């Protein structure tokens, strides 16, 4: 897990549940959800 994701994810933990971080982490591992889930998370920034 990149540091950037951990730091930015920490701020989002206050707004959203840890489920979001789990989904992104699983998405990276699978590789398929990364395109959908990852893109959605980055769009919020």
Swiss-Prot record:
What superkingdom does the record give? Viruses
Q: Name one Pfam family in it.
A: Corona_NS4
Q: Which family does it belong to?
A: Belongs to the coronaviruses ns4/ns4.8 protein family.
Which protein are we looking at? Non-structural protein of 4.8 kDa
Taxonomic lineage is: Viruses, Riboviria, Orthornavirae, Pisuviricota, Pisoniviricetes
């Amino acid at each position: 897990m990149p540091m950037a994701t951990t730091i930015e994810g920490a701020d989002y933990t206050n707004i959203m549940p840890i489920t979001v971080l789990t989904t992104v982490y699983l998405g990276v591992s699978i590789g398929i959800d990364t395109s959908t889930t990852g893109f959605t998370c980055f769009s919020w920034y």
